[in-house]
Amino acid sequence: MNKNSFQITNIKNVLFFGTSKIFKKFIEINNKYNLNTEIFTSKDQSKNINKDIKHKIINKIDKNFENYISKNYQPENTLFFSLGSRWIFKKNFIKFCKGNLVNFHGARLPQDAGGGSFSWRIMKNDRINNLLIHSVTPKIDNGQIIYYKKKLFPK
């Protein structure tokens, strides 16, 4: 894993995958900067999204989904942001995103790669919390680290 610079020029859109309790705040920030926002989630994760927040339920990320994105957005001007997404992004979709697909990971990498990182930390009595954003590559949780911030959970 590398920690290098990450830059998208002329960003116009932010597309979220997954779920977050703070989607409303993300939308407010994006609106402030005149960025189009769209949220895609799975059926089960949609239950965690406030009903006032517009979102689309999708079953899978496939060619039809890519066609939808191409019709409505330009991938080179779009930030694709995964927040606890249920999907494992395949090589073709990662390439389609033009290097603009990132993932929020709430734990350290590479120590806590993959799913279940919160549970593993509890079982290991690990008090280190980490907010981390990394680029998405075909290998899970192995992309370039773009941002991270460590904190200790109180005892």
What label would you give each PLM region?
Residues M1-K155:
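One-carbon transfer enzymes
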